[in-house]
Design a protein with these regions (language model features):
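Alpha-helical transmembrane segments that form the membrane-embedded catalytic/substrate-binding core
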Residues: 229-236, 278-290, 328-346
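N-terminal signal-anchor transmembrane helix
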Residues: 40-216, 305, 350-362, 372-378
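Terminal transmembrane helical module of multi-pass membrane proteins
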Residues: 317-348, 361-370
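N-terminal pre-first-transmembrane soluble regions of secretory-pathway and organelle membrane proteins
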Residues: 1-52, 108-112
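N-terminal TM1-TM2 helical hairpin plus the immediately adjacent luminal interfacial "cap"
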Residues: 171-280, 322-327
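Structural signal for the C-terminal ends of transmembrane alpha-helices
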Residues: 292-297, 341-350, 376
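Cytoplasmic-side transmembrane-helix entry/capping segments in multi-pass membrane proteins
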Residues: 250-255, 280-283, 304-311, 357-360
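Residue-level signature of the transmembrane alpha-helical core
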Residues: 182, 257-261, 283, 288, ...
Length: 378
């Protein structure tokens, strides 16, 4: 039996296969579109790929098509909380006299043959691997089905990775931190009636400046009363398992401790000499920051979650800190910033661009040094 493959379908499949299997793009479902395929990779310089198979017979129709593409791109940019978004627009069926035009943030090319795609200078600039890709103009039914199977396997592999990240795991480190905080609190209540240990471990500007740096860490495990520890441990019980599941046990512990430490340094930098600061709030705000980074990183998958849920929760908690007396708002802000930067620096699973991780580490170090300068020098 002879199977005939349409030339245009062959070109579409080869382009899709390349972007999905080699460049880690994923399809986007956009309602109301016909003869268009949209792909996304939020870690790429060209975050969107559009493959348009509609026939464009003149430049007026091209302008209308470009306007539609820009409108959809703006909508995706807004829903994914992206500050900058560039797109590659591939036109597979245009009239001979139609001259393509580039618009702001959109690179447009005409593709009649797969060689047009492979040899295009824009494609080679953004996707250097395309030069070595096996992309030929020959239409082969056997290859057609092989490429389809490759894409299916890649999709299954990606789904398994996501399932592993979002699967339920026993939050051992979270429970250990809760137990440790409660044990420290009970010790202080039962055996430190006069507050000797309490004041020896609390965060205080003058004592830290005089060399008692350990206070920046020990103060994270002290709480003033039952309401204070109950609120913090409840927040840790809610947020901790999520972060531990998303990042893994070791990375979760790093996020908790380092963001809490930066929160303590922020607190110390802005407190008066007669003030003490205690509590796990800085570390807990660090967990909020790590969740914010995670939802931003997977913003295409978790559509709208960052904007509709995570950011409002963070803003509400910060607002409470500003309005209620006695709350160490500087520690909360420091912890939040620390959580975002540490999460960025350590990355999520085996994903993440090295440049982002390096930037996260560098900015965290610079932020820490700047706050330490305020504590010890200024």
């Amino acid at each position: 039996m002879n199977i005939k493959i349409d030339k245009k379908d062959d070109v579409i499949l080869k382009i899709l296969h390349y972007f999905i299997t080699e460049e880690d793009y994923k399809p986007i479902i956009i309602n109301g579109l016909e003869n268009e395929i949209w792909l996304e990779n939020m870690q790429s310089d060209l975050k969107l790929i559009r493959i348009n198979t509609n026939y464009i017979h003149n430049e007026e129709q091209l302008k209308t098509d470009m306007y539609k593409a820009q409108s959809i791109m703006r909508s995706i940019k807004k829903s994914t909380f992206s500050f900058r978004m560039n797109m590659l627009n591939l036109l597979l069926d245009t009239g001979e006299k139609v001259k393509v035009m580039d618009t702001k943030n959109i690179e447009t090319i005409k593709v009649d043959e797969i060689s047009d795609f492979k040899k295009n200078k824009v494609v080679k600039e953004f996707f250097p691997k395309v030069s070595n890709a096996e992309l030929t103009d020959q239409v082969d039914p056997i290859e057609f089905f092989k490429l389809t199977e490759d894409m299916n396997q890649k999709t299954i592999k990606n789904e398994k990775k996501l399932a592993k990240i979002f699967s339920q795991k026993k939050p051992v480190i979270t429970y250990a931190l809760i137990v440790l905080n409660i044990m420290v609190y009970l010790f202080m209540v039962l055996y430190d009636v006069d507050g000797t240990y309490f004041y020896a471990l609390a965060n205080n500007y003058e004592f830290v400046q005089n060399g008692q740096i350990y206070r920046l860490l020990t103060s994270m495990f002290l709480h003033s009363d039952i309401i204070h520890i109950a609120c913090n441990m409840y927040a840790l019980y809610i947020l901790g398992p999520q972060v531990e599941r998303y990042y893994g046990k070791t990375k979760f512990l790093l996020i908790y401790l380092l963001s809490g430490l930066l929160g303590s340094i922020f607190s110390c930098a802005f407190m008066s000499a007669d003030t003490i600061s205690i509590g796990a709030s800085g570390a807990i705000f660090g967990l909020l920051g790590s969740i914010a980074y995670f939802t931003y990183y997977y913003r295409a998958t978790l559509q709208g979650l960052l904007r509709s849920q995570v950011v409002p929760v963070i803003l509400l908690n910060l607002a409470i800190g500003f309005m209620v007396p006695g709350i160490d708002i500087s520690g909360h802000i420091g912890g939040l910033i620390g959580g975002i930067l540490v999460s960025m620096g350590i990355g999520i699973g085996d994903k993440g661009r090295k440049a982002d991780q390096i930037n996260g580490i560098i900015v965290f170090i610079l932020m820490t040094l700047a706050m330490l300068y305020m504590v010890f020098v200024k």
